[in-house]
């Protein structure tokens, strides 16, 4: 994400990096805006966003676009309880349209809720690999 660019410009930037057409990106903007609840903040440079706002936008962009593989690194820990509930629903939807979702998290509850396999690492080595 470019901190000098607006939220809207970052939506286009990330979409282009993912190989989307301008039309595909434009079609996803309303969904991203509604999901993130950023409203007029999408018109402001990202350097004015709080860390939580930036995380919500990054998560909203990544999950609004069609992906074969989605990597989430503590992505749904940002925001209040209402946003986290929206994020959980979004992840549930991702499982129906994304082939592989990889979540890096310290949250046992998150892993047990959304994952069918858990791999735990310690000091760069696999310590546990199990189906859950």
Language-model regions, residue ranges each:
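Conserved ABC ATPase "signature" region
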Residues: 12, 24-41, 58-60
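Conserved ABC ATPase signature
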Residues: 45-49
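A short, proline-enriched helix->beta-strand linker immediately N-terminal to the Walker B motif
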Residues: 63-72
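H-loop/switch region of ABC-family ATPase nucleotide-binding domains
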Residues: 105-106
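H-loop (His-switch) and adjacent beta-strand-loop-beta switch element
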Residues: 114, 118-130
């Amino acid at each position: 994400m470019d901190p000098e660019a607006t939220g809207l410009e970052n939506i286009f930037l990330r979409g282009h990096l993912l190989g989307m057409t301008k039309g595909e990106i434009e079609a996803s903007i309303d969904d991203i805006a509604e999901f993130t609840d950023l409203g007029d903040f999408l018109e402001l440079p990202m350097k004015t966003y709080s860390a939580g706002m930036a995380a919500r936008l990054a998560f909203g962009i990544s999950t609004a676009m069609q992906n074969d593989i989605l990597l989430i690194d503590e992505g749904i820990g940002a925001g209040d309880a209402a946003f986290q509930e929206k994020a959980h629903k979004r992840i549930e939807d991702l499982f129906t349209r994304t082939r592989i979702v990889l979540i890096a998290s310290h949250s046992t509850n998150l892993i047990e809720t959304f994952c069918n396999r858990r791999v735990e690492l310690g000091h760069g080595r696999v310590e546990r690999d199990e189906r859950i």
